[in-house]
Amino acid sequence: MPDRVVRVAVTQAEPVWLDLQATIEKTCRLITEAASNNAQLVAFPETWIPGYPCWIWSRLVDFDLNVAYIKNSLRVDSPEMERLQACAREAGIAVSLGFSENSNNSLYISNVLIGSDGEIKVHRRKMKPTHMERTVFGDASGHCLQSVAQLPFGRVGSLSCWEHIQPLLKYNTITQNEEIHVAAWPPLNSEVGDEIPWSMTAEGCKTLSRTYAIESGTFVLHCTAVISESGINSLGTLGGALMSTPGGGHSTIFGPDGRRITDHIEETSEGIVYANLDMDELVVNKMFADCTGHYSRPDLLWLGVSQEIKPVVRPQRAEVDKGTNDQVE
């Protein structure tokens, strides 16, 4: 018998597009459902609240949708976030939540890890939004490099979407002794046109999550959203490069050796994927390779990290020195 088994849940669902309150309601229902099935952790996809801005891959700008998106994005210090925290606490389950964060009407692709006590353990932002995402979202600061927290059942962290192609960012995350990793993605197309890289398809993105599992030796919760015909009509993505056909749901779980340990849900369907994680498997894989431990060479190769918050207004060094000298006088 394994010493430690952790039951996890990965959602595959469609948000209520551009509707903060309705998506909060749906989130609480899914949290409660996962907890009722004895899950200790439930994962939600990238920008689950209020949904991914899919139209950015169809046209350069949409003023009306962008304004609605800003208004319906989630603030960290808000009654809506407090409600989600209370829901996690009442259900007794940890929650990894991807959301569009509104900070003074600037947006960020963000994630919070909420413990079963309802407290926020990690709040991070995507370090660099990908390609067209930069028309909507800003960059993270250095403090968001701390992305893993200890929960009662293990160490949990997350990255968003194509952060999984960033070798240095991945390595920084792995050094935090992660055991369970949430890979948060938007709806993913099974097929795309020749002009779109294969790495942006559902299979390409699953490959990135699976590679992270092998590199890190962690369990990876690959979490995606669904977009329906109604969602396509609401967001005006029909005929666009991505997220223009119903589907997008490819949620699954990978073991630390890279094997898929869950069955797929049909990509147009909503549901929750569950798995019981045998945490002894982490030890078996670390025996073979530990890229931040016995299988590393820090005498030859190492990573430098700055975790500072860089404020937009800060004194010049000369002014700081002058202030110090004035005090001495």
From Swiss-Prot:
Keywords: Hydrolase. PROSITE patterns: CN_HYDROLASE (PS50263). Its EC number is 3.5.5.1, 3.5.5.5. It catalyses: a nitrile + 2 H2O = a carboxylate + NH4(+); 4-chlorophenylacetonitrile + 2 H2O = 4-chlorophenylacetate + NH4(+). It is an enzyme of class 3 (hydrolase). The keyword Hydrolase applies. InterPro entries: C-N_Hydrolase, C-N_Hydrolase_sf, Nitrilases_CHs. GO terms for molecular function: arylacetonitrilase activity. Residues 6-279 form the CN hydrolase domain. The active site is at E46, K126, C161. Belongs to the carbon-nitrogen hydrolase superfamily. Nitrilase family. Nitrilase that hydrolyzes preferentially phenylacetonitrile and heteroaromatic nitriles, but has significantly lower activity for (R,S)-mandelonitrile. Also acts on dinitriles like phenylenediacetonitriles (PDAs) 1,2-PDA, 1,3-PDA, and 1,4-PDA, and cyanophenyl acetonitriles (CPAs) 2-CPA and 4-CPA. This is Arylacetonitrilase. It comes from Hypocrea virens (strain Gv29-8 / FGSC 10586) (Gliocladium virens).
